[in-house]
Design a protein with these regions (language model features):
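A general secondary-structure junction signal
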Residues: 5, 47-49, 67, 89
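A short, surface-exposed loop/turn module that caps and links secondary-structure elements
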Residues: 35-64
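Arg/Lys-rich, positively charged N-terminal/basic patches that mediate binding to nucleic acids
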Residues: 1-32
């Protein structure tokens, strides 16, 4: 079953900021994972995140493109079968995870 896909506004901007080849790579990866975005321990493609340094990313999953260094962090809204993209970017110095933590804090406080 294909899950619906939702981007928070900042994640749309992240996607737009990538060059064309990076955008194609991450879009293909997202579409693949979207077929079954559950965590790998539930038979899906998602790689669970826990705590990265002092950043609580529990409940989030990642898509990792090793060759290009791109990462996408998403969370599942199971009641709506929605895959919500939180951040897309380069892994450089864990920056993508720091950004995800900040955005999740904002989402959770709304």
């Amino acid at each position: 079953m294909k899950w619906s896909l939702e981007f928070i506004d900042e994640a749309i901007n992240d996607l737009k900021s990538l060059d064309n080849s990076q955008r194609k790579q991450i879009t293909r990866a997202i579409e693949k994972v979207r077929q079954n975005p559950l965590p790998d321990y539930e038979g899906g493609y998602g790689k669970p995140l826990g705590n990265k340094g002092n950043i609580n990313l529990s409940g989030c999953l990642k898509i990792k493109l090793k060759a290009s260094g791109l990462r996408a962090v998403y969370r599942l809204i199971r009641t709506e079968t929605t895959m919500q993209m939180v951040v897309i970017g380069l892994r450089a110095d864990e920056e993508v995870y720091k950004t995800a933590g900040k955005r999740l804090q904002k989402i959770r406080s709304e």
